[in-house]
């Protein structure tokens, strides 16, 4: 789960407390394009966003009854995997979760991903609380890029991380974990504030992942989007 919390006027962020310094630095880069993305659901339905982004189709237009686009797909479909694959790219999907969830193991094959890598395929998983860390996934993306380079091929990789998955309870990262406070203009309950602090910590780690990957690819000769 990720969003730019600095877009919301109810928060009192400062330069020191900004949870997204890497994102904001990247937005100011003269070569960067930035904006807002509208996703097909709120607080759930991750696979629907994946489907929309990869196919250009809209989950909301597929079925009035289906809760997930992935449960509607049952055959080969055009997607970015096929577009890039046709141009000789190595294409891959990474997700540190269960392959059966949202039927991803079949759907990504139907979407044309050359390689699918799930938690069961990964070694020495690193966790922060219950979920695999974003930093661990950044390392796998770097390794996948190196593999593509060694093959003499460009790479299209789509990774769905999981660290900031719900729930956002105070014990998410273990008893005694101290979350940086989140200052707001609104009067909110202690429970709501606690959830915000937990969620923001995950957003902060996602931004750190972005910073790591930006620094890594900035040192590469190959052009990277």
Describe the residue ranges of each PLM region.
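Solvent-exposed soluble domains appended to multi-pass membrane proteins
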Residues: 1-225
């Amino acid at each position: 789960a990720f969003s730019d919390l600095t877009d919301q006027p109810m928060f009192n962020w400062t330069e020191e407390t900004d949870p997204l310094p890497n994102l904001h630095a990247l937005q100011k880069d003269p070569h960067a394009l930035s904006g807002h993305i509208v996703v097909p659901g709120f607080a759930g339905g991750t696979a629907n966003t994946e489907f929309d982004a990869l196919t250009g189709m809209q989950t909301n237009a597929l079925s009035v009854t289906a809760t997930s686009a992935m449960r509607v797909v049952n055959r080969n479909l055009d997607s970015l995997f096929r577009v890039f694959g046709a141009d000789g790219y190595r294409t891959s999907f990474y997700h540190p979760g269960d392959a059966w969830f949202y039927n991803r193991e079949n759907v990504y094959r139907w979407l044309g991903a050359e390689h699918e890598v799930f938690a069961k395929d990964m070694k020495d998983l690193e966790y922060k609380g219950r979920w695999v860390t974003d930093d661990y996934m950044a390392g796998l993306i770097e390794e996948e890029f190196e593999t593509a380079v060694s093959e003499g091929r460009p790479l299209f990789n789509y990774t769905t991380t999981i660290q900031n998955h719900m729930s956002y309870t105070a014990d998410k990262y273990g008893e005694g974990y101290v979350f940086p406070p989140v200052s707001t203009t609104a009067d909110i309950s202690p429970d709501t504030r606690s959830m915000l602090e937990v969620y923001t910590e995950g957003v902060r780690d996602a931004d750190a992942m972005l910073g790591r990957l930006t620094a890594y690819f900035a040192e590469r000769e190959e052009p990277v989007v």
